[in-house]
């Protein structure tokens, strides 16, 4: 068994310097960072607004944000596939099997996480400082900025949780990205598709091997 495991490991380390490996890692980070940024831009203010604002349907939105923490990736991927396919309502945009579709898919998965965690992070500061902010006549936007600054550590944790969701995603990006070599192939899809039924070390063969004499 030792001999069987040695070869894939050697191949993996040798592949670290190949152009395809660098391209896969670069695309993975680009897609995940972009999706996380989009999710943060939407999720942070939404999570804060759910804490300080009172409006009809607020409790339902909080419930949905928490429920979508466990949103099945395959459901998101399938829904986006149907929307972006040629016969779908957004087929004219030609987004299917592109990095842009992967960003959208990952952002949809990360947004509920950042929203729900931000809402929880700001609840306590709002109870403590909300009265003072109202007395000072702070607007809702100003209050949101202040609360996000006060709970910045928890907010950073929420964003990191969103990034962890995006960088580890497989099913959704596989459906909408297609795992096209040199175009939409990222780290997770490359490893999973090359893994041979759970054999230890087989996932290393997902990476390109350097040319041999």
What are these regions (language model features)?
Residues 19, 53-58, 123-128, 138-140, ...:
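Juxtamembrane helix-boundary/capping and inter-helix hinge elements in multi-pass membrane proteins
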Residues 117-155, 188, 203:
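Short cytoplasmic-facing helical segments at TM-TM junctions of multi-pass membrane proteins
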Residues 109, 131, 172-174:
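Hydrophobic side chains within alpha-helical segments
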Residues 2-5, 14-123, 150-170, 205-213:
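Membrane-water interface segments at the C-terminal ends of transmembrane alpha-helices
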Residues 15-20, 175-212:
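Interhelical loop and adjacent transmembrane-helix boundary motif
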Residues 11, 92-96, 185-190:
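Short juxtamembrane loops and helix-capping segments at transmembrane helix boundaries
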């Amino acid at each position: 068994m030792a001999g069987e495991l040695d070869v894939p490991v050697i191949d993996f380390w040798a592949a670290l310097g190949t152009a395809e490996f660098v391209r896969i890692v670069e695309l993975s980070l680009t897609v995940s960072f972009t999706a996380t940024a989009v999710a943060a831009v939407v999720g942070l203010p939404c999570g804060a607004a759910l804490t300080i604002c009172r409006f009809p349907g607020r409790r339902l939105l909080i419930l949905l944000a928490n429920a979508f923490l466990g949103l099945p990736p395959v459901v998101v991927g399938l829904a986006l596939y149907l929307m972006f396919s040629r016969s779908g309502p957004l087929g004219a945009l030609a987004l299917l099997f592109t990095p842009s579709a992967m960003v959208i898919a990952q952002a949809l998965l990360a947004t509920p996480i950042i929203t729900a965690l931000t809402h929880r992070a700001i609840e306590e500061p709002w109870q403590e400082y909300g009265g003072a902010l109202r007395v000072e006549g702070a607007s809702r936007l100003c209050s949101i900025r202040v609360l996000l600054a006060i709970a910045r550590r928890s907010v950073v944790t929420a964003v990191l949780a969103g990034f962890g969701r995006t960088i580890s995603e497989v099913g959704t990006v596989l459906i909408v990205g297609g795992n096209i070599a040199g175009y939409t192939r990222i780290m997770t899809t490359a490893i999973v598709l090359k893994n041979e039924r759970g054999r230890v070390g087989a996932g290393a063969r997902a990476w390109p091997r350097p040319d041999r004499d």
